[in-house]
C-alpha cells in the first residue's frame, strides 16, 4: 500500500523520524523495565516469592532494589580473560537492539484517513533486515563466553550456536511465507495488508512455527540451554557481574519486547482498526497504536507465562525439534502460503 504524504510535510519527515527514533528508544527502554517487573511479579505470584510480592506497591520498588544491587556490586574480571572481548560484548548486544528499532514500526497514526506508520524509516526489505540484525546479538554472547576464559561459558556459547543455526531456518521460512502471501517484504505493508484477515487465521501453522522459533531465538524457556544453571552454573554469563550482567539481561528483555512486536505485526493484524476509527481525528491518532500495544503486551505475557509452565528441553531434543519437526512444517506452510497468495491475487 502506498502512503500519500502531503507536500508540505515532506521537508519535515527527516526531523519527525529523528524525533520518533529518540522517543522509541526511550519507550522501549521503559518497556524493558516494565517487562522485568512483569516477569518478576508473575514469578513471585506463582512461586510465592517474598521480594516482588512485598517490596512496595505491587512490588514496584523491587526494581529499585535490583538497580542498587547491580550498581554497587564490584566489577570483577576473570584472570587471563580477553579484555577486548569481555569488556565490549554489551556493545554488540545493545547495538543489535538499536539496529532493529530503526526499521520496526511501533504503531501508526491516521490523519484525515491517511496512514502514517510510527517507524524511524521504511525499507522495502525491512522484515529481512530486522531478522538479520537481530542475529547480531549472538556475537555479543560469544564475545562474553570466549573472553571469560571459562569452560562453562564456552559450552553455553556453543549451545547457543547450535540452537540459533537450527531455528533461524524455520523462522526465516515462515517470514518468507508471510511476505509471499502479502507480496511485500516491507513489514509496514504486511501489517497494513492484514485488515480483518489476520495472518494467524490464514497461516495458523506458520504462526505456530514462527512463535516456537522465536522463543528459541530469544533463548527463553524451554530453550535456555545456553545458561542452564543446573548444568552450566550460568552458562555464557557465568563470569559477568554487576552492571555488565544487568546490561546483558536488559538487552535480552528488549529483544523479547521486539519479538512480541514482530508476532503482533506479522500475524495478529498489527495496528489495523475499523475504518470509522481511522477516519476520526481523535481516535485515529490514539487507537491504532494502543491496539498494537495491547497485542504486544498479550504476547509478552504468554512468553513470560510459558517460562513457569514448561520444563527445559535437553540440547539434543532442541536440535531434533528444529531440524526434524519445525523445518518440514515451515516448508509445508510455505507451499500453503504461496498457493493461498496466488488464489488471493497477491
Curated annotation (Swiss-Prot):
Record carries keyword NAD: no
Pfam families on file: NADHdh
Topology of the protein relative to the lipid bilayer: Multi-pass membrane protein
GO cellular component terms, semicolon-separated: plasma membrane
TM ranges: 18-38, 91-111, 125-145, 170-190, 196-216, 257-277, 284-304, 326-346
Gene Ontology MF annotations: Methanosarcina-phenazine hydrogenase activity; NADH dehydrogenase activity; reduced coenzyme F420 dehydrogenase activity
Keywords recorded for this protein, A-Z: Cell membrane, Electron transport, Membrane, Methanogenesis, Methanol utilization, Oxidoreductase, Transmembrane, Transmembrane helix, Transport
Primary enzyme class: oxidoreductase
PROSITE patterns given in the database record: COMPLEX1_ND1_1
GO biological process, one term: methanol metabolic process
Main localization (coarse): membrane
Task of the protein: Component of the F(420)H(2) dehydrogenase (FPO complex) which is part of the energy-conserving F(420)H(2):heterodisulfide oxidoreductase system. The membrane-bound electron transfer system of the complex plays an important role in the metabolism of methylotrophic methanogens when the organisms grow on methanol or methylamines. Catalyzes the oxidation of methanophenazine to dihydromethanophenazine. It shuttles electrons from F(420)H(2), via FAD and iron-sulfur (Fe-S) centers, to methanophenazine (an electron carrier in the membrane).
Family as reported in the entry's similarity comment: Belongs to the complex I subunit 1 family.
Subunit structure of this chain's protein: The FPO complex is composed of at least 13 different subunits. FpoA, FpoH, FpoJ, FpoK, FpoL, FpoM and FpoN proteins constitute the membrane sector of the complex.
Name of protein: F(420)H(2) dehydrogenase subunit H
